[in-house]
């Protein structure tokens, strides 16, 4: 809903060419703002109302391994904590009513980007496993109440509420 907030420890945002084309493909921005082709400033930390299109972004080299999605009005949320050394990037997909009528926010911890494996491999931006090699990672999901914005989620799942907006 438009009352939803996304907090992540991101610095950079890269626009994927998928979507409604509001931002220049592969353009780079500072979290949480993205400037559209028309000069409009989008705040990716706030979910816009339905009907606002659809887009896909990469948040490379996040500072810590977590993200939080909070309903600011109800003051409830969900967070995910994961090992940053395994998943150093986030993918952010927003279908805001403009793609198949879906209204959703999808945040995915990722080992590489972009989502096209051949391109990620060409750019040296994907993880590799040797034949027979296995990878295990501990991922922690947390639910919380009484918080409108998140400053940080500690590795053990402790929510640190933002006191004056979010530093990210």
Task: Map each language-model feature to its residues.
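Hydrophobic residues positioned within well-ordered beta-strands of beta-sheet architectures
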Residues: 65-67, 105, 137
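Terminal connector regions
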Residues: 145-168
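A conserved acidic, glycine/proline-rich C-terminal tail/linker
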Residues: 112-128
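A structural signal for short secondary-structure junctions
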Residues: 60-63, 71-74, 97-101, 129-135
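Short Pro-Gly-centered flexible turn/kink motifs
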Residues: 127-145
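Glycine-rich active-site loops that engage anionic ligands at enzyme catalytic sites
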Residues: 70-112
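Active-site/ligand-binding surface loops and adjacent short beta/alpha elements
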Residues: 1-79
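A broadly conserved detector of short glycine/acidic/proline-rich loop/turn motifs that flank catalytic sites
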Residues: 12, 19, 73, 84, ...
């Amino acid at each position: 809903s438009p009352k939803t907030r996304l907090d992540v420890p991101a610095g950079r945002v890269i626009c994927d060419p998928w979507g409604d084309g509001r931002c220049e493909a592969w353009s780079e921005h500072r979290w949480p703002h993205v400037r559209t082709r028309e000069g409009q400033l989008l705040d990716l930390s706030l979910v816009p109302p339905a009907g606002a299109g659809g887009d896909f972004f990469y948040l490379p080299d996040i500072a810590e391994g977590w993200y939080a999605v909070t309903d600011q009005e109800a003051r409830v949320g969900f967070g995910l904590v994961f090992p940053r050394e395994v998943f150093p990037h986030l993918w952010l997909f927003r279908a805001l009513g403009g793609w198949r009528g879906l209204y959703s926010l999808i945040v995915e911890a990722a080992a590489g980007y972009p989502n096209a494996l051949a391109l990620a491999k060409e750019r040296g931006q994907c993880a590799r496993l040797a034949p027979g090699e296995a990878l295990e990672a501990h991922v922690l999901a947390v639910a919380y109440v009484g918080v409108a914005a998140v400053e940080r989620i500690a590795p053990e799942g402790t929510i640190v509420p933002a006191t004056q907006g979010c530093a990210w």
